A protein has these predicted regions:
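Acidic/histidine-rich catalytic neighborhood
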Residues: 502-558
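Glycine- and aromatic-rich loop/turn segments at beta-sheet edges
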Residues: 383-396, 437-452, 459, 509-525, ...
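Beta-rich accessory regions
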Residues: 2, 177-223, 229-235, 240-246, ...
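Catalytic cores of secreted or luminal carbohydrate-active enzymes
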Residues: 113-143, 147-152, 689-729
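Active-site core of glycosidic bond-cleaving carbohydrate-active enzymes
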Residues: 43, 48, 402-435, 455-459, ...
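Acidic/polar, glycine-enriched structural segments that form the non-catalytic walls/loops
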Residues: 1-262, 271-399, 419, 429-435, ...
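Beta-strand segments within the central parallel beta-sheet cores of soluble alpha/beta enzyme folds
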Residues: 8, 211, 424-427, 441, ...
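Short coil/turn segments at secondary-structure boundaries
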Residues: 343-358, 384-392, 423-427, 440-445, ...
Length: 733
C-alpha cells in the first residue's frame, strides 16, 4: 500500500477564519511557549475573546502569552502553611492526615480563608505580555501629533480573513483596521522561546505602523492570568539599542527576588527551571526590530515599537530571569524559515491517519479533529511540565496542572510514534520525587504518592477533592510503559525505573487486605468526583481496582527486566485486588451506598478501555454497565475526555460502531471548535485532555493493541463505510 500523502491530509484541515469568532482564537507555539492571537494576528482586542471568572472577578481573555517557566507568587500571608491544612482521616490501618479544605462551589473558591486560598493560588502561571496593534493618530485628532499612535477600538475593525497553515505553523491575517488594510504574519520558533511578527500596510493606505507590548501583574484569579490593577507591584524597564532593545520585568518590586517560581528553593522543589535571576529580574524580553524602527517606553508597563513606513518586523525572545537571552541574530525570516522546516518534519514523523476514502459523513470531522489535536497538543502539551488543562491558551485553576490529566494530555505522543514529546515532561517527576516520597512517608506509606493539583514546585493544593484521588498514581507507570513500547526498551527502563519502583511501592502499600482481597479506601474519591462528600467511606471503584492490578503487573515486569528479583508483595496485591461490587447486573461505581451517582465521569467502565484487560473486570459486566450508561446518564455533567474514554471501552469490547458513535457523540462538551479546541464551558473554553484523549482513542481504534485478534483498524466498523488508512501507530498494551 502506498504511503499516506501526509501533506494532503494536513492541508485539508488548514484553519480559515472570517471575522471574529470570540470562542476560537488561533495559536502558534512550540510546547514551551505559545501565543494566542485574535483576528488581527496579535492580541489587539482581548475583550472580544472573553473568559469569565467563576468567582465573579474581572473578565479574562483567551489571548494569552504563556510559557512553562513563567510563574509568580504574591507575598505569602501569615498562616499559609500546608501542614495547617492537614486533617485526620480514619483508614483501615489507623489515622492518616490528609491535606484538606472546605467544600467548594464548583470552581469558585473565593469563600476559603486567606491562607488556604494563597496555597491554592500560588504559584500561578503568568500572562507574559499582551502584544497588539496600534493605529496612527489622525492629524485632526485633538492633541494628535504626527507619528503618534493609539489603540484602535473594536468598532474600527473591518473585513478580515485569517489562515493557520498547519504545515508551516504560521498564522497569516489580512484585516482592515481603522480604514487601513494590513497583512500580519505570526510565528513561533520551534526550538526557542521566540515569537516573530511582520506587519505590512497596504500600498493604498497611509504609511505608519506600531505594535504595543503591555505587561500585567500576576493574578490569583482562577481563569484570568493578568492583573492590570496593581501597577505599583511590578516594574518594567526598557533598555534600547540599535535594532531593538531589552525589557526587564521585576515583579513585587525590585527589593527582593521576583516571584517567577519553579526552581530549587521553592518549598523543596528541585531541578525545575524558571527561577528569578539574582538581580531580581523575573523575566526578560529581547526585542529585535528593523534598523529604522523606534522602540520606546510609553507608560509604566508599556513598550511601543513603531515605524513610519509600511513594514514593521518584530522578534520577541522571552526568557526567565536566570536564563540568557537568545544569542546570535534572530530575524522574522529566520523564525519563519525555522517553522517552515520544523512542521513538515513533525507531520512526517510518527503516525498518520487518512479517512478520505470513507463514506460515513462523520469521517471528515474525525480526521479534522485528529489533525488539529496533533497541532494543539504539540504546541502546548509537549513541554517540560505536565500541561494545565487549558494548555498555554490562558489560565484555568490558575495555570496549575492536574496529574490525573497528564495521561490524557500526553499519552498519545507515544502511541502516535512521537515518544520524545512525552519524555519532555516526564523529567518533572524526578524533580518532585522527594516531595512525593515525603507525602507517602507522612501518611505512613512506602514509596511516592503523586499529588493531584500542583505548580512546578510539586506542592499539593488544599482541596476537598484533589488529595483524596488515587487514579493519577498508576499514570506514571502507564506513561513510562508507553515510552518503553515506543522506544529503546532498555534505555527507558533504566531511565524511569526508579519512578516506576517508587510509584508501585506506594500502590502496593496503600492497598488494604480484606476478606475478599486487597481493596482501596477510605478515604478515597474515585475518578468520578461525585462522591467528594463521601470521601471518608468510599471504597473500591472499579476503574482504580483494575488500574492497580494492571500497573503493578507492569512494574513487576520492569523489575525483572532491570535484573532485580520480583517483589512478592506486588504480585500478591496486583493479583489479589478485590472484585468490584455488582448490583443489578452492572458494576457499581463505589463499594458503599449510594453505590452509583449518575453524574460526572462514568468511570466504572474505564478499567477495560483506558486500561487493558485484567482479571478484575468481567467483560460481560463491563458491556452491561456501558449499556446502562448509554441508557441513563447525565451527559451534560460529563467532560471532554469521557467520550474518547468510552470509545476505548467500546473498542476493547469489540463494538466499533459504538466506539465511533461515542467518540463523536453530539454533546456540548464534545464540541471541537474551528480552531480545534475542545470547549467545555464559558470559563473553560479550551480543554486539552479532550484533544489528547481523542488522539489516544484514535490510536487504539486504528493501531490496535496486544491480543486484539489482528483485525485492521479494530475500532472502526468493517462495513465499507469507513476506509481507514493508517501508518506508524504503536500498538497499545
Amino acid at each position: 500500500m502506498a504511503a499516506i500523502d501526509r501533506q494532503a491530509v494536513v492541508r485539508r484541515h488548514t484553519v480559515r477564519v472570517a471575522g471574529v469568532d470570540p470562542r476560537s482564537p488561533l495559536q502558534v507555539g512550540n510546547g514551551e511557549l505559545a501565543l494566542s492571537v485574535d483576528v488581527t494576528g496579535l492580541q489587539t482586542f482581548p475583550e472580544l475573546y472573553p473568559v469569565p471568572d467563576p468567582a465573579g472577578g474581572p473578565t479574562g481573555t483567551l489571548l494569552g502569552t504563556q510559557s512553562q517557566w513563567g510563574w509568580h507568587s504574591v507575598p505569602r500571608p501569615a498562616g499559609a502553611d500546608l501542614d495547617a491544612t492537614r486533617r485526620p482521616y480514619r483508614t483501615p490501618r489507623g489515622e492518616v492526615r490528609y491535606v484538606d479544605a472546605a467544600p467548594l462551589s464548583g470552581s469558585d473558591d473565593s469563600a476559603l480563608d486567606e491562607a488556604t486560598l494563597w496555597l491554592r493560588a500560588n504559584p500561578h502561571r503568568l500572562d507574559l505580555a499582551r502584544i497588539g496593534l496600534l493605529v496612527p493618530v489622525d492629524a485632526d485628532d485633538a492633541g494628535g501629533r504626527a507619528g503618534d499612535h493609539r489603540a484602535p477600538s473594536p468598532d474600527e475593525l473591518g473585513a478580515s480573513e485569517q489562515v493557520l497553515d498547519l504545515w508551516t505553523g504560521t498564522v497569516t491575517s489580512q484585516v482592515v483596521l481603522a480604514g487601513r488594510r494590513l497583512r500580519v504574519t505570526t510565528a513561533c520558533h520551534p526550538a526557542r522561546d521566540v515569537l516573530a511578527v511582520r506587519v505590512v500596510v497596504d500600498d493604498a493606505a497611509p504609511p505608519g505602523v506600531a505594535v504595543r507590548l503591555a505587561f500585567p501583574y500576576g493574578s490569583e484569579s482562577w481563569s484570568n492570568a493578568a492583573d492590570w490593577t496593581r501597577p505599583g507591584a511590578h516594574l518594567t524597564e526598557l533598555t534600547t539599542r540599535p535594532g531593538g532593545g531589552q525589557v526587564l520585568r521585576r515583579l513585587d518590586g525590585a527589593a527582593g527576588p521576583a516571584g517567577v517560581e519553579g526552581a530549587a528553593g521553592v518549598e523543596g522543589a528541585a531541578g525545575v527551571e524558571g527561577a528569578a535571576g539574582a538581580d531580581g529580574v523575573g523575566y526578560r524580553l529581547d526585542l529585535r526590530t528593523g534598523a529604522r524602527h523606534a522602540v520606546e517606553q510609553t507608560g509604566p508597563h508599556e513598550v511601543v515599537v513603531s515605524d513610519s513606513g509600511r513594514v514593521l518586523e518584530l522578534v520577541v525572545a522571552l526568557a526567565p530571569g536566570g536564563a540568557p537571552v537568545v544569542d546570535g541574530p534572530v530575524t522574522v525570516d529566520g523564525v519563519l524559515d525555522a517553522a517552515a522546516d520544523h512542521w513538515p518534519r513533525f507531520w512526517g514523523s510518527g503516525a498518520a491517519l487518512d479517512l478520505a476514502g470513507s463514506t460515513d459523513p462523520r469521517a471528515h470531522e474525525l480526521e479534522r479533529r485528529a489533525v488539529l489535536s496533533q497541532y494543539l497538543t504539540a504546541i502546548q502539551c509537549a513541554g517540560s511540565l505536565p500541561p494545565q488543562e487549558t494548555g498555554l491558551v490562558g489560565n484555568s485553576w490558575r495555570g496549575r496542572f492536574h496529574l490525573e490529566m497528564h495521561w490524557w494530555h500526553a499519552a498519545h505522543f507515544a502511541l502516535w510514534g512521537r515518544p520524545e514529546l512525552l519524555e519532555r515532561s516526564m523529567a518533572w517527576y524526578d524533580a518532585v520525587l522527594p516531595r512525593a516520597r515525603a507525602t507517602a512517608r507522612l501518611q505512613g506509606y512506602a514509596g511516592a504518592r503523586w499529588p493531584k493539583q500542583v505548580g512546578p514546585d510539586g506542592r499539593e493544593s488544599p482541596s476537598d477533592i484533589g488529595p483524596f484521588l488515587l487514579w493519577q498514581q498508576p499514570h506514571v507507570i502507564h506513561l513510562a510503559e508507553l515510552l518503553r513500547r515506543a522506544g529503546d526498551s532498555a534505555r527507558v527502563v533504566q531511565r524511569y525505573g526508579d519512578l516506576v519502583e517508587q510509584t508501585a511501592r506506594f500502590m502496593a502499600d496503600v492497598a488494604e487486605p480484606g476478606p475478599d482481597g486487597y481493596g482501596l479506601g477510605p478515604p478515597l474519591i474515585p475518578a468520578q468526583e461525585s462522591y467528594a462528600a463521601l470521601r471518608d467511606r468510599v471504597t473500591n471503584p472499579p476503574f482504580e481496582l483494575a488500574y492497580w492490578a494492571w500497573a503493578l503487573g507492569v512494574a513487576q515486569r520492569w523489575r525483572v527486566q532491570s535484573g532485580h528479583p520480583p517483589e512478592p508483595r506486588w504480585d500478591e496485591v496486583g493479583r489479589g485486588m478485590v472484585r468490584p461490587l455488582v448490583r443489578d447486573g452492572v458494576y457499581a461505581a463505589i463499594g458503599v451506598e449510594p453505590f452509583t451517582i449518575r453524574t460526572d465521569h462514568p468511570s466504572m467502565v474505564y478499567g477495560l478501555g483506558v486500561v487493558p484487560a485484567t482479571d478484575v473486570l468481567d467483560p460481560a459486566l463491563v458491556r452491561a454497565t456501558l449499556s446502562s450508561v448509554m441508557a441513563d446518564w447525565d451527559w451534560p455533567s460529563t467532560w471532554g475526555w469521557d467520550y474518547p474514554a468510552l470509545a476505548m471501552t467500546a473498542t476493547r469490547l469489540g463494538d466499533p460502531a459504538l466506539a465511533v458513535d461515542l467518540l463523536l457523540r453530539d454533546e456540548a462538551k464534545n464540541l471541537h471548535l474551528p480552531n480545534g479546541h475542545n470547549r467545555q464551558t464559558d470559563h473553560l473554553a479550551a480543554y486539552l485532555p479532550g484533544n489528547g484523549g481523542l488522539l489516544a482513542a484514535v490510536a487504539l481504534m486504528a493501531g490496535g493493541w496486544d491480543d486484539d485478534g489482528g483485525r485492521p483498524a479494530p475500532g472502526f466498523p468493517d462495513d465499507g463505510t469507513w476506509v481507514v488508512r493508517h501508518e506508524g501507530f504503536v500498538p497499545a498494551p
